[in-house]
Amino acid sequence: MAGKIGFVSLGCPKALVDSELILTQLSAEGYKTAKDYSGADLVVVNTCGFIDSAVEESLSAIGEALAENGKVIVTGCLGARKNADGSDLIHSIHPKVLAVTGPHATDEVMQVIHLHLPKPHDLYTDLVPSARVRLTPKHYAYLKISEGCNHRCTFCIIPNLRGDLVSRPIGDVLLEVKRLFESGVKELLVVSQDTSAYGVDIQYRTGFWDGKPVKTKMFDLVNTLNQIAREHQAWVRLHYVYPYPHVDDILPLMAEFAEHGYGVLPYLDIPLQHAHPDVLKKMKRPASGEKNLERILAWREACPDLVIRSTFIAGFPGETEGEFEYLLNFLDEAQIDRAGCFAYSPVDGATANELANPVPDQIREDRRARLMAKAEEISVGRLAKKIGKRLQVIIDRVDDHGGIGRTIGDAPEIDGLVRVLPANKPSKRYRAGEIIRVTVISSQGHDLIAET
C-alpha cells in the first residue's frame, strides 16, 4: 500500500521549485499526498530562514506538524541555520523531528523518507520518467535556472544557506521549458538568486539544444526562451535580474514583444535595495546608484513598454535622512513601476549587524511607510496612463463577475491585478490561462478595471 506524505511549502519561488521537485519524486515512486496531517504517515516541511518573521513561521509550522502528526522531516533554508555554538537550530527547538536537511536537497529528503516509510515497489512507476508536479495553477510555472549566489551582501545570509552560484546545464533547462509549455503552461517565471550571473560559475560553457550549440549565458538563454515561448504562444517573465551591463543586450528582445504578443515580456524584476552610493557600499551591492539610474533610463529609451519592479530596504544601519531622501528621488527619476520595501531587520549571522549607527525602529518603520507611499503614487500615476488603451491580459481565475487577470507588467502574487468585466456575449466565458486583449476603463490603486 502506498505511503501518504503530508507536505508544507514555505518561502520564496525558489523554495517552491524545490518543493515541486520533491513532490515529483514522491509521485514517481508511488507515494500519495495527504490532504491533512491526520491522514499522513509522515510530514515534510520545506522552510524559509531568511528573515525573522520567516523563521518564526517555519518553526511554528514544524511545531504544528509535530503536534498533529508526530513524524516530521524538515528541509529548506532554515535547515541550514545554526546556533551560535554551531549546533543545529531546528533540533535545538524541535528535537523530535526525524531529520533536518538544507535547501535543494531532494535526494537527502527521499533517503529519510525511504528509511521511515519504504517506497512501494511498482515495476511500471519505477521505470516511467516522472512528470514534474507543480504547486502553481496549471497555466504558470517557475523555472529555476541556478542555485546559490556569489555575492556577499552584508544584510543577507543566503550564500550561507544555499551556497555559491551553481548554474543548471542549459540543455536541461531548455528541456524542462519545452515540457512545461507542452503541458499547457502559458507563463514561465524565471527565478534564481542572480539571473544575470547565469553561467558565470562554469565560464559560460557551451551546451546543446535541438542539435545546436548554445552557451550557458543569460543572453543565449533568454534568446532561446523567447523563441520557444513564441512557438507556444506563451510568456516568459524574468526575475532577480541584477543590472549588469550585459543585461542591455536583452532589451531589444523585449522591445519586440509588442509586435508578436508572445515571448520574453518587457518586465524586469531588479533587486536594487537602495540608490545612494554610500548605502550601497555598506550593503556591498554589486552596482552603484548613479549607474543604475543611467542604465534604467537607457532601458526605457530602448523599450518604452518596459515595466520595472524592485525591492528596497529602508533604515539600513547608518542610513541618514539625506540618504533616504536620495532614495525617494531615485524612485521618482527612475519611475519604478512596482516597488516593495522592508524596514531593515537584523538577520542572525549577517555582517550588517556589526555596522555602526543602527537606525531606531520607529524611524525605520516611518521610512518604510514613506517609501511605500511614494511607490504607490508613482504606480497610480503610471497606471492612469493605461486607461483607454488595449492591453494583453492573462486570466488567472474566473468568477460570476468576469475574470481576474494580469497584464504583462504584473507578476503573480506580488504585483497588481486586472478585473475583466463579463464578456458582452452571454455564451462567452473566460478560461484560466487564456491570454486575451482588453480595453482599460479605469484604475483602482495598483489594479485596473477592463472590458473586452
From Swiss-Prot:
It is found in: Cytoplasm. It comes from the Bacteria. [4Fe-4S] cluster 1 binds at C12, C48, C77. Residues 3-118 form the MTTase N-terminal domain. Binds 2 [4Fe-4S] clusters. One cluster is coordinated with 3 cysteines and an exchangeable S-adenosyl-L-methionine. Residues 384-452 form the TRAM domain. It catalyses: L-aspartate(89)-[ribosomal protein uS12]-hydrogen + (sulfur carrier)-SH + AH2 + 2 S-adenosyl-L-methionine = 3-methylsulfanyl-L-aspartate(89)-[ribosomal protein uS12]-hydrogen + (sulfur carrier)-H + 5'-deoxyadenosine + L-methionine + A + S-adenosyl-L-homocysteine + 2 H(+). GO terms for molecular function: 4 iron, 4 sulfur cluster binding; aspartic acid methylthiotransferase activity; metal ion binding; protein methylthiotransferase activity. GO terms for biological process: tRNA modification. Catalyzes the methylthiolation of an aspartic acid residue of ribosomal protein uS12. Belongs to the methylthiotransferase family. RimO subfamily. This is Ribosomal protein uS12 methylthiotransferase RimO. It comes from Polynucleobacter necessarius subsp. necessarius (strain STIR1). The lineage of its organism: Bacteria, Pseudomonadati, Pseudomonadota, Betaproteobacteria, Burkholderiales.
